[in-house]
Design a protein with these regions (language model features):
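Glycine-rich ATP-binding loops of the HATPase_c
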Residues: 9-15
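Acidic, metal-coordinating helix/loop segments flanking the phosphotransfer/catalytic sites
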Residues: 79-97, 138
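Disordered, acidic interdomain junction associated with two-component signaling
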Residues: 25-54, 140
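Detector for a conserved hydrophobic position within an alpha-helical segment of the HATPase_c
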Residues: 4-6
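Charged docking surfaces used in two-component/phosphorelay signaling
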Residues: 64-72
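Alpha4 helix (beta4-alpha4-beta5 surface) of REC/receiver domains from two-component response regulators
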Residues: 108-119, 125, 130-151, 156-161
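Acidic catalytic/metal-coordinating carboxylates
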Residues: 81-85, 106-112
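Glycine-rich GHKL/ HATPase_c ATP-binding element in histidine kinases
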Residues: 20-22
Length: 169
């Protein structure tokens, strides 16, 4: 939550009362300016060419968000809920790109999953996604060949750019 608040340049007000508990109020900046563009996608958004993407995340809502955004961008999306399911899927199927959540519980995290994927598909393109800061395990995944690190929360512009860059390299 704190990372999201910081990303949006907001702040948190906390009030505690021993008898009533704690109240957290989240504040985010807003604008009163009307949108002047009428485009569904800004010029910064790079659309897909129906490439296949496997999204691996243990949180159903995160899988759904990524799937909806990528679908709008013209990608063919498959989602799975664990590293183990991703490896099983890739034993039987090909995909142009894998987007791996770094922190998954229980089971393999993004780094362990990527190591398993490399054993069966050594040239698999992948992106690591996380809502947390870039850790040593993320850096290790990048050293092993993960092409990009994508910070959550996803935005249309951010995910479109990172996915397109990885697919094009």
């Amino acid at each position: 939550v704190w990372g999201t608040v910081q990303d949006h340049k907001g702040y948190i007000d906390i009030q505690s009362d021993e008898n009533r508990g704690t109240v957290f109020e989240l504040y985010f900046p807003m604008t009163r300016k009307a949108r002047t563009d009428r485009q569904v996608f800004s010029h910064d958004v790079i659309r897909g060419r129906n490439e296949s993407i496997l999204v691996v995340d243990d949180i159903p809502e995160q899988r759904e968000i990524a799937s909806q955004i990528l679908g709008r961008l013209n990608y063919a999306v498959t989602t799975v809920s664990s590293g183990e399911k991703a490896v099983a899927f890739l034993r039987e199927n090909d995909t142009d790109l894998v987007i791996l959540d770094m922190i998954m519980d229980p089971g393999m995290d993004g780094l362990d999953t990527y190591r398993e994927i490399l054993a069966i598909k050594p040239n698999q393109k992948a992106i690591i996604a996380s809502g947390y800061a870039e850790t040593d395990r993320v850096k290790t995944a990048l050293d092993l060949g993960v092409g990009r690190y994508l910070k959550k929360p996803y935005t249309l512009e951010k995910i479109s750019r990172v996915v397109r860059q990885e697919l094009d390299c």
